[in-house]
């Protein structure tokens, strides 16, 4: 594949990992060297071996003959066979200090590569553990916690300083961005997109309604609700909706997914939809929620929906769902999980002058990941909105190089 420049699969990898290179190393049985090569562009080889969206496979040259190479699967072979591979030695300190706000995949990626350049990084994370959405958004049946920790441990080996349960904002007890700008040579904001969007229907505040982010975050904290015998409806059709539905299923619930378009328009990856169906999740496609019904105690006891049909394409290119007259029906549920998307938390941007955001509340950056405020960079979901893990990791590496 190296005779083709740029290599198609590498060109489509947001982190720019040398895929043909580590394929060759695994083929030679040099799995530890393969892991080292992956880490040159992606400090989460183990996590990505489990949950990467593998866009590279769609451009694999093998597709010209039959099917793509199972790139993610071979990465899994590399990390499993290699076992523990220590972090490379860091160079002499440059004396520069970088503050990183957010201990998720983007923030930790930036910290790792900055440390390897000789700069001292400090990660400020508001929760009790590092990992961000890798820990609090992806269920353990997809990414075992001990395997995620393997990657984090190697990142920490480079000398990253960590301050857990530390928030940045303007509330009492929080650090301000201006304080950090005075103390550090640069700042990288990687706070993700964890603010839930509202669907805007009656009954949304009833007892038994929870956001998918909140639900999965509780699971990540080790708090497992008893859903035995419960009838759960997940509203939404993305990967987060699939994760929430499959998690609820494992906790004993009967689970339905309600999505307003057809199955062909589901934004979730095909493999995630397949797994959800295989495990027993019921799909109510071409249905739109109209009202969440409640009992005399204010708790959910039904979801009123209306049938939809597809009309003309909208601005996204997908056919617009149109309500079918007189087609309302009630779905018998007692728990509703909202999975209709998230947006960046405005805590930092809303309290810091000179930090521009776009109409979706995402931080505005240039091609070097620099924001509109001097010495402040940003990346990951805080810039793109909710996106993929590998895209966030790639942004962290790009920001590190720019800084």
Model feature map: region roles:
Residues 1-21, 43-65:
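Local cysteine-cluster metal-coordination motifs and their immediate loop/turn environment
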Residues 92-99, 149-201, 291-304, 309-312, ...:
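Feature captures the FAD/FMN-dependent oxidoreductase FAD-binding
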Residues 244, 382-403:
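A conserved FAD-binding loop/helix module that cradles the flavin
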């Amino acid at each position: 594949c190296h005779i083709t420049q740029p290599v198609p699969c590498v060109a489509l990898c947001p982190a720019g990992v040398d895929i043909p290179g580590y394929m060759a190393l695994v083929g030679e049985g040099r799995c530890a060297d393969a892991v080292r090569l992956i880490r040159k562009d992606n400090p989460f080889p183990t996590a990505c071996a489990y949950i990467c969206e593998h866009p590279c496979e769609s451009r694999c040259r093998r597709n010209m003959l039959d099917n793509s190479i199972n790139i993610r699967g071979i990465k899994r072979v590399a990390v499993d066979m290699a076992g523990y591979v220590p972090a490379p030695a860091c160079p002499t300190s440059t004396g520069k200090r970088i503050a990183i706000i957010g201990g998720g995949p983007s923030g930790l990626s930036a910290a790792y590569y900055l440390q390897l350049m000789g700069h001292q990084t400090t990660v400020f994370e508001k929760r009790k553990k590092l990992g961000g959405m890798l820990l609090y958004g992806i269920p353990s049946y997809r990414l075992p916690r001990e395997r995620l920790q393997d990657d984090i441990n190697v990142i920490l080996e480079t000398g990253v300083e960590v301050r857990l349960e530390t928030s940045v904002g303007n509330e009492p007890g929080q650090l301000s961005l201006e304080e950090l700008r005075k103390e550090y040579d640069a700042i990288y904001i990687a706070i993700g997109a964890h603010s839930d969007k509202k669907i805007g229907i009656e009954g949304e505040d009833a007892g038994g309604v929870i956001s998918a982010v909140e639900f999965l975050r509780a699971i990540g904290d080790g708090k497992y609700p008893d859903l035995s015998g419960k009838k759960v409806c997940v509203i939404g059709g993305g990967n987060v909706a699939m994760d929430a539905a499959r998690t609820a299923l494992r906790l004993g619930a009967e689970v339905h997914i309600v999505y307003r378009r057809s199955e062909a328009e589901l934004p979730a990856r095909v493999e995630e939809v397949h797994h959800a169906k295989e495990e027993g999740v019921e799909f109510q496609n071409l249905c739109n929620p109209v009202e969440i019904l409640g009992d005399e105690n204010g708790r959910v006891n039904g979801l009123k929906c209306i049938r939809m049909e597809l009309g003309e394409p909208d601005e996204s290119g997908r056919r617009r769902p149109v309500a079918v007259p007189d087609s309302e029906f009630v779905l018998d549920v007692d728990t509703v999980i909202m999975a209709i998307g998230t947006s960046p938390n405005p805590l930092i941007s809303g309290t810091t002058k000179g930090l521009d955001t776009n109409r979706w509340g995402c931080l505005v950056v240039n091609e070097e990941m620099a924001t509109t405020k001097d010495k402040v960079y940003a990346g990951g979901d805080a810039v793109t909105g909710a996106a993929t893990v590998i895209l966030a990791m790639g942004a962290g590496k790009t920001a590190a190089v720019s800084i």
